[in-house]
């Protein structure tokens, strides 16, 4: 059972996932800091509050902290956009490699077709003689 677990952990997918989770957590903390310390104050200038998370309204005893939600929405949009850009770049990279492989495959098919034609000619001339 220990060996099976070791094989599972050492597979590329599990390691890639672990690295992705750690990088995602680090990236999220950076984006959160940027939103809280840079973007939030800029928006806060126009909203009338320096700290967006302090924006709130009350209805009776209920307090609605919409500033904190606004911070999280901005975080989500930034992280989502950057992930979109990363995936777009990865797809573009794989598409270029796929085109190269297709071109190589086409040249291999042409070469094999030419070899087959020559073998047919060779067999026909051998059979006639």
UniProtKB/Swiss-Prot annotation:
Known role: Channel that opens in response to stretch forces in the membrane lipid bilayer. May participate in the regulation of osmotic pressure changes within the cell.
Family statement drawn from the similarity comment of this UniProt entry: Belongs to the MscL family.
UniProt name for this protein: Large-conductance mechanosensitive channel
Lineage top rank: taxon: Bacteria
Keyword Acetylation belongs to the record: no
Gene Ontology cellular component list: plasma membrane
Membrane topology type: Multi-pass membrane protein
Sample GO molecular function, one term: mechanosensitive monoatomic ion channel activity
Subunit record text: Homopentamer.
Transmembrane segments: 8-28, 30-50, 67-87
Organism: Oenococcus oeni (strain ATCC BAA-331 / PSU-1)
Keywords: Cell membrane, Ion channel, Ion transport, Membrane, Transmembrane, Transmembrane helix, Transport
Pfam families: MscL
């Amino acid at each position: 059972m220990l060996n099976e677990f070791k094989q599972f952990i050492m597979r590329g997918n599990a390691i890639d996932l672990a690295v992705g989770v750690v990088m995602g957590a680090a990236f999220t903390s950076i984006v959160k800091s940027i939103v809280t310390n840079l973007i939030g104050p800029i928006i806060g200038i126009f909203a009338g509050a320096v700290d967006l998370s302090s924006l709130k309204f009350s209805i009776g005893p209920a307090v609605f902290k919409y500033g904190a939600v606004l911070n999280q929405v901005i975080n989500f949009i930034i992280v989502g956009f950057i992930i979109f850009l990363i995936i777009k770049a990865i797809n573009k990279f794989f598409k270029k490699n796929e085109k190269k492989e297709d071109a190589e495959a086409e040249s291999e098919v042409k070469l094999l077709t030419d070899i087959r034609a020559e073998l047919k000619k060779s067999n026909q001339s051998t059979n006639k003689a």
